[in-house]
Amino acid sequence: MTDSIQDLLSIKLARAIANPLFPEVDSQLRSGKHIGQEYLDNYSFLADFQHELDSFYRRYNVELIRAPEGFFYLRPKATTLIARSVLSELEMLVGKVLCYLYLSPERLAQQGIFTVQEVHDELINLADETKLLKAINLRAGGSDLDKQKLAEKVRSAISRLRRLGMIHAVGDQHSGKFTISESVFRFGAEVRSGDDPLEAQLRLIREGEAATAQSLQEEKNGLKDNMDQSAVENEQYFENEENEGIA
């Protein structure tokens, strides 16, 4: 019996589960949170026991992934035994905008701090506002009330992404200010932190996943179509990870 238990539970895995950090880290991962280096203790714990914990989670038909940028998250398979949720189209679009802002020169100029309003404005610039409003309400006609509802949905999307560890609030929780985590690269897997930021930004623009004021002026109609397509491509990106969204 002892040998059988040891086959299933290695000494190092037993140490990981017995670690005081395990309950918190396990709960965060199961909720879909991405754990990066900013969570020093939890990140170090995952780095130390990555192999053992990956074997542990595979019994639930999920994988413990360490992205090229370093952050950890659980990727469910189609037969996962752990409850999961999928991001909405708007939440995915907001994630794309956050990835774009992370790469933009403005991040350095603003000491890495952005506001909810900036994300909202960038989303309106990059996407067709009419289609965004229709996504919120099919009968939306562009009234002030419709635009207010869209703004509320954007705030809700940002809150959801914050709970997933993709942004971090700065100052008072009602200030609307935050910094962006590298985990937003789940919305732009083709761009990696080793790339030159300006080159990565240009590539995003060419592929219809971001834009500048100049590119919007030059390719306004085409860009709108590309942003619509980028939402579909983003869904396919998550579906390619065992046909699922973020856990």
From Swiss-Prot:
<comment type="function">
    <text>Involved in chromosome condensation, segregation and cell cycle progression. May participate in facilitating chromosome segregation by condensation DNA from both sides of a centrally located replisome during cell division. Probably acts via its interaction with MukB and MukF.</text>
</comment>
<comment type="subunit">
    <text>Interacts, and probably forms a ternary complex, with MukF and MukB. The complex formation is stimulated by calcium or magnesium.</text>
</comment>
<dbReference type="GO" id="GO:0009295">
    <property type="term" value="C:nucleoid"/>
</dbReference>
<dbReference type="InterPro" id="IPR042037">
    <property type="entry name" value="MukE_C"/>
</dbReference>
<keyword id="KW-0226">DNA condensation</keyword>
<keyword id="KW-0131">Cell cycle</keyword>
<protein>
    <recommendedName>
        <fullName>Chromosome partition protein MukE</fullName>
    </recommendedName>
</protein>
<keyword id="KW-0132">Cell division</keyword>
<feature type="compositionally biased region" description="Basic and acidic residues">
    <location>
        <begin position="217"/>
        <end position="227"/>
    </location>
</feature>
<feature type="region of interest" description="Disordered">
    <location>
        <begin position="213"/>
        <end position="247"/>
    </location>
</feature>
<feature type="compositionally biased region" description="Acidic residues">
    <location>
        <begin position="236"/>
        <end position="247"/>
    </location>
</feature>
<dbReference type="InterPro" id="IPR042038">
    <property type="entry name" value="MukE_N"/>
</dbReference>
<dbReference type="GO" id="GO:0030261">
    <property type="term" value="P:chromosome condensation"/>
</dbReference>
<keyword id="KW-0159">Chromosome partition</keyword>
<keyword id="KW-0963">Cytoplasm</keyword>
<dbReference type="GO" id="GO:0005737">
    <property type="term" value="C:cytoplasm"/>
</dbReference>
<dbReference type="GO" id="GO:0007059">
    <property type="term" value="P:chromosome segregation"/>
</dbReference>
<dbReference type="GO" id="GO:0006260">
    <property type="term" value="P:DNA replication"/>
</dbReference>
<comment type="similarity">
    <text>Belongs to the MukE family.</text>
</comment>
<dbReference type="InterPro" id="IPR007385">
    <property type="entry name" value="Scp_MukE"/>
</dbReference>
<dbReference type="Pfam" id="PF04288">
    <property type="entry name" value="MukE"/>
</dbReference>
<dbReference type="GO" id="GO:0051301">
    <property type="term" value="P:cell division"/>
</dbReference>
